[in-house]
């Protein structure tokens, strides 16, 4: 762009949602251009002044600078930058899509010394395409269609840098690449750099100066995440969330998540002004009152629960049975334990979860993370590497906590793998559990005592599972997630062949592929006697190699179903991969989740249309009417009926 105008794309579009780093990419590009021009920061300063006007001025939508005149030596190069294409300031009421279309039309006819950098979300891009169609702007419509295809996740998406038919235009999908993977050119994963930056010791209070002392959950989280194992497990779980959900962590999401894990989220307006360590110190003081046997209150009794919940492992997996509060309180009162700080603290803690308590920015993401990965739901046979020389199955923890909280605590205490706050809370729960086992308490209400005791043991066991699972990445379906991640990140696609074979068996029945002729997509099949099925030879399923030239690697692997014109691509989703793995372990096909059944039905429906129009394929087809023993087949002249292998 600087040394040889016309040799590189000059219309650059960064496409993606908010928080994906589009603005930062523009800033880096300007820095590189400034250096290439020999502008000595004059280009950076000129743009900074335009995008950061003095006083109450508004940030303009488009800023144009004569970059060539600022360089040394001077040359012809003008740069126009749209930092946010959804902005409509000073547009006299015109929508953002019209402004974007006007800018693209102007830039296409501009000389090679004019460059255009634009950050745009997919919604504005689609609206601009609709506007181009309405205007009848053929060239602009073709350009926007090419951009839309190039930044899509389709397996046949063409090159986006540059566009195939528009060498002067380049686009890049900013939401396609994972921040948890190292860049293709080498270096550290952005998410890893972000976490390590937040954990730098120089950015925290000196050791021993925290107002909360050893009771501070945030300083404790920082200390644990500074260890390679804990940090690696956190990043691995965040990556597993991506591969399972199909979503990507944006920069904005990661910044919010790290802030939430290391500084907490305070809901009460009274606590909003407190520093994280100050908030922890206040709760630690309140807990001292409860621990000395003070009168139970919502603040004092639940303090230890809130401190434990603020540790990163419990902030990440935060879900508790929020609806258990009323029945829990009833059992507590029937047993006369409403003066017990631990029992009432448990009730008040669960009740607090009925109100919103997560940061609104990442609340939905945290809910999805807990649903997909919660270590409390991991298989009992899953093994935890607690230390270098100690490894055990979660079943060992479950068995001990099912007998008593104290037995579970004694088993884990000697391994020194729980935090001080966790040991303190579980110790109090163990004392309450022991009290519920005493004849004096059980005699009053044996059923209430049993219910409360079961709940306490389950609570303690879940707490321990989350602590162990988060620090070792022993989460729900961890082996399947690890295998799926390996398949996705395998550049050669070797792991896809085995999966393709299993999907082929799911789509076909024995050696046949069946298409219903009496129903449309989504309708249930009629009774067997009223069915008419077109039966063709089985459709093959093979890995589909996505185009990787001039574009980011596809975040989703695809399979190719069928041959020739009737072939169709299907996405290998986590649900489909998991279903295949579970079928290998003996699960019945009837137990497949609805999402997988819908994907298979959709694939059959998409294949059906081209198949019924493929004359060559229909030569080997037959129609089953009613019983599978009766088929209509094509003969040299007309059709015949075939029954049990005989022809009539």
Predicted regions and their residues:
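Extended charged low-complexity segments that act as oligomerization/scaffolding linkers
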Residues: 1-6, 15, 23-233
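Short coil/loop residues immediately preceding or within conserved phosphate-binding loops
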Residues: 9
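Hydrophobic, glycine-enriched assembly/anchoring segments
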Residues: 25-28, 605-648
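Walker A (P-loop) phosphate-binding loop of P-loop NTPases
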Residues: 19
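Extended alpha-helical coiled-coil/bundle linker/stalk regions that scaffold oligomerization
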Residues: 188, 192-518
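C-terminal structured domain segments
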Residues: 428, 462, 466, 523-625
């Amino acid at each position: 762009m600087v040394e040889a105008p016309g040799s590189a794309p000059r219309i650059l579009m960064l496409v993606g949602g908010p928080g994906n780093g589009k603005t930062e990419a523009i800033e880096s590009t300007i820095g590189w251009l400034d250096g290439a021009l020999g502008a000595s920061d004059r280009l950076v300063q000129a743009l900074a002044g335009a995008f950061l006007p003095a006083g109450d001025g508004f940030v303009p939508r488009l800023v144009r600078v004569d970059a060539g005149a600022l360089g040394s030596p001077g040359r012809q190069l003008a740069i126009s930058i749209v930092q946010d294409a959804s902005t409509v300031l000073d547009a006299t009421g015109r929508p953002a899509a019209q402004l974007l279309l006007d800018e693209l039309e102007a830039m296409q006819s501009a000389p090679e010394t004019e460059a255009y950098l634009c950050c745009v979300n997919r919604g504005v891009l689609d609206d601009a395409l609709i506007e181009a169609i309405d205007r009848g702007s053929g060239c602009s419509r073709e350009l926007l269609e090419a951009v839309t295809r190039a930044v899509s996740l389709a397996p046949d998406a063409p090159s986006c840098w540059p566009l195939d038919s528009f060498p002067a235009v380049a686009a890049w999908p900013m939401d396609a690449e994972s921040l948890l993977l190292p860049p293709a050119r080498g270096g550290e994963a952005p998410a890893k750099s972000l976490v390590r930056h937040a954990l730098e010791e120089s950015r925290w209070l000196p050791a021993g100066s925290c107002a909360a002392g050893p009771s501070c959950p945030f300083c404790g989280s920082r200390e644990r995440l500074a260890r390679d194992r804990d940090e690696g497990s956190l990043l691995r779980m965040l990556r597993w969330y991506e591969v399972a959900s199909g979503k990507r962590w944006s920069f904005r999401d990661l910044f919010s998540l790290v802030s939430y894990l290391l500084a907490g989220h305070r809901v009460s307006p009274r606590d909003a002004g407190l520093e994280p360590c100050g908030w922890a110190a206040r709760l630690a003081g309140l807990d001292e009152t409860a621990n000395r046997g003070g009168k139970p209150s919502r603040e004092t009794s639940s303090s230890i629960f809130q401190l434990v919940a603020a540790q990163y492992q419990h902030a990440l997996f935060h879900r508790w049975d929020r609806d258990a509060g009323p029945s829990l309180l009833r059992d507590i009162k029937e047993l006369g334990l409403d003066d017990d700080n631990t029992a009432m603290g448990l009730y008040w803690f669960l009740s607090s979860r009925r109100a919103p308590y997560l940061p609104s920015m990442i609340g939905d993401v945290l809910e999805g993370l807990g649903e997909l990965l919660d270590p409390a739901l991991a298989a009992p046979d899953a093994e935890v590497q607690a230390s270098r020389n100690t490894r055990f199955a979660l079943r060992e923890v479950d068995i001990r906590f099912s007998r008593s909280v104290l037995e579970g605590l004694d088993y884990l205490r000697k391994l020194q793998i729980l935090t001080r706050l966790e040991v303190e809370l579980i110790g109090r729960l163990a004392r309450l559990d022991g009290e519920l086992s005493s004849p004096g308490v059980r005699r009053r209400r044996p059923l209430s005592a049993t219910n409360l005791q079961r709940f306490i043991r389950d609570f303690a066991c879940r707490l321990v599972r989350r602590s162990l699972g988060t620090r070792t990445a022993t989460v729900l379906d961890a082996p399947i997630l690890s295998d799926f991640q390996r398949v996705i990140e395998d550049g050669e696609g070797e792991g896809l062949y085995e999966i393709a074979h299993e999907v082929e068996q799911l789509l076909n029945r024995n050696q046949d592929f069946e298409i219903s002729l009496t129903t449309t997509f989504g309708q249930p099949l009629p009774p067997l006697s009223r069915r008419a099925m077109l039966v063709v030879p089985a459709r093959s399923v093979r890995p589909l190699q996505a185009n990787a030239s001039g574009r980011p690697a596809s975040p989703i692997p695809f399979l190719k179903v069928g041959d020739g014109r009737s072939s169709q691509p299907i996405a290998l989703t986590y649900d489909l991969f998991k279903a295949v793995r579970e079928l290998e372990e003996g699960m019945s096909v009837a137990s497949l989740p609805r999402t997988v059944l819908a994907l298979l039905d959709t694939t059959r429906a998409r294949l059906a249309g081209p198949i019924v129009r493929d004359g060559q394929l229909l030569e080997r087809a037959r129609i089953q009417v009613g019983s599978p023993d009766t088929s209509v087949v094509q003969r040299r002249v007309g059709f015949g009926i075939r029954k049990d292998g005989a022809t009539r």
